[in-house]
């Protein structure tokens, strides 16, 4: 096997992982990702709106009891987590708009932004799952009391 054929085999073997990484990173700055971020922001806004405006009124032994979201620590926690999710989604939607509009930026900078978004998504997902588990456990404790 000659030197030229060895280098072409090495290039083909090394190019495949690089191409798959680039294709994966391209997915983070696609218009579909932007639409998903906007949909998440809309759903978080609806969650907050329903949570804050809902009231439940019951009469027990001629005593009028009004239940609102701020009476329960679990619902306050849910409102805070929904607000954080809303802010995060809007922030990343803005980052995607900047990434989609700035096609004149160097590829290395775009890769860095894609990796930043990927890592931030992973960290946020872990934290959001932890918050969701805490909210559900607090909610179940409130249900047993």
Swiss-Prot record:
Residues 1-31, 97-112 are cytoplasmic. Keywords: Cell membrane, Membrane, Transmembrane, Transmembrane helix. It comes from the Eukaryota. It is found in: Cell membrane. It is a multi-pass membrane protein. The chain crosses the membrane at residues 32-52, 76-96, 113-133. One of its GO terms (cellular component) is plasma membrane. InterPro entries: CASP_dom. Its main location: membrane. Residues 53-75, 134-145 are extracellular. Homodimer and heterodimers. PANTHER family: CASP-LIKE PROTEIN 2C1-RELATED (PTHR33573:SF30), CASP-LIKE PROTEIN 4A4 (PTHR33573). Belongs to the Casparian strip membrane proteins (CASP) family. This is CASP-like protein SELMODRAFT_406854.
